[in-house]
Amino acid sequence: MPYIGSLKVNQFRNLADVDITPHSQFNFFFGQNGAGKTSILESIYYLSVGRSFRTHLPQRLIQDNTDRFLIFITLYNGTQFIPLGVERDCQGDRCLRINGETASSWSLAAKRLPLCSLSAMSHRFLLDGPRVRRQFLDWLMFHVEPSFFSIWQRLQRSLKQRNASLKAKLPLGEITHWDKMLVEDGERLHQLRQNIVTEFKPLFTQMLQQFLPAYPLIGHYFRGWSEKYSLMEQLQINLKQDLQRGYTQAGPQRADFRLTLRDLPAQDILSQGQQKLVTYALHFAQGLLLKEKTGISPIYLIDDLPAELDANKRDCVIDLVNCLESQVFISGIDPNEIRLPPHSTLFHVKHGKVAAL
């Protein structure tokens, strides 16, 4: 399994100078609100995907009165440790380096550093629009299906061109010129998503049974256009409305994966704590499927685990994570709220300083 052997963070949020050696399995960061616990997890997340899970404004990540931040790790890849780091300045320039070389794409970091992130807002999986749920499925395909990323990139280009043509109200021939490419890649992407959902659902049911046995949720995959028509037929049917609205209404960019309980949306029935457990079940199943398909376990980032969960549920989460055999970074206020296994390291975070205990 991949794991982070060392972590250095400079001038990222309130973390002025952090240099720690995480445990290869459990790591628990505790401290008061605002101490910097979540920022530790956020820095790892940023290094993997090039963005924050807390803000869309990257300039807020740079510590006050400084002009740049640096995040650096050594990552064990199964055979050796490789260096991976990023520097970003207040002008927006950033440099990602992997194994001593400048990386041309952030997908290279994401591939080497697979993360399952469970933040305080993860329950939004059920509440937010379809985009977050598509991203959940696409994360899996990015890591397990070699052809996915190129298909996804081509689809985005075709969709962007078609939408621009619709918005500009170009002649019909120039609009429909993009349909063939959009349909080819759209149908392939749909098939990949459908296959991954079929493999994912039994694992999700298995995980959910551990947390909420009385709530047999059912997952429903919607491909993004009517089951009555092919994608090409749907584009032709929708063309007049697409022209009026200036964008493509049907296609895999509209896909969704919804959860229901007794034919009702899960979010209408479950409490916030229960929604949090559903999200945990989703991400643990995601990690299990990745391991089944590739032999690689993701690193888990679990922010504020104790919140909204009683002691029994907290213990259940820890026991399940322990079975996943992955490196885990967990945050919370009180270390006594978590029953950590022997193979773990406890870190105290105070005013942006981090110390192993």
UniProtKB/Swiss-Prot annotation:
Keyword Iron listed: no
GO biological process, any: DNA replication
Protein name: DNA replication and repair protein RecF
Family: Belongs to the RecF family.
Compartments, record wording: Cytoplasm
The protein's role, per its UniProt record: The RecF protein is involved in DNA metabolism; it is required for DNA replication and normal SOS inducibility. RecF binds preferentially to single-stranded, linear DNA. It also seems to bind ATP.
Gene3D superfamilies: P-loop containing nucleotide triphosphate hydrolases, RecF/RecN/SMC, N-terminal domain
Main location: cytoplasm
Pfam families listed in its UniProt record: SMC_N (PF02463)
Residues that bind ATP: G31, Q32, N33, G34, A35, G36, K37, T38
A cellular component annotation (GO) from this entry: cytoplasm
One of the record's GO molecular function terms: single-stranded DNA binding
Keyword annotations of the record: ATP-binding, Cytoplasm, DNA damage, DNA repair, DNA replication, DNA-binding, Nucleotide-binding, SOS response
